[in-house]
Amino acid sequence: KSYLDYGIFQPIQIASTVALNGPQDCVKDVVQRYQNRRNVLVNGLNRIGWPVALPRATMFVWARIPDPFRHMGSLEFSKLLLREAKVAVSPGIGFGEGGDEFVRFALVENEHRTRQALRGIRKVLNLDDQEP
């Protein structure tokens, strides 16, 4: 037994090898889907006045809490978005003390639902008059 495969069920190892060495078309499709979701969210947040950088190679978007709301901390701000905008984000404090000025969006919803979320966020934040 090697250090790498100890305790890992052999059919899982074989399936992993086949997936890594096989056709990658489905990977390209998934990457494109997440890039589209990311672009809709980040571009929408920027349009409504919440500046967010475009992340690379992740299914999450980390966003610094807008200045007028930063005093709340990430937990209370997350609760505000959930209660008022019906949008769930992860409070940054859950990832350590340094994360308390941030929230994390997961790119798990389709583009239509993301646009709905942006409209709700826009109403709560009231930062800008532009549509998401």
Predicted feature locations:
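PLP-dependent class I/II
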Residues: 1-132
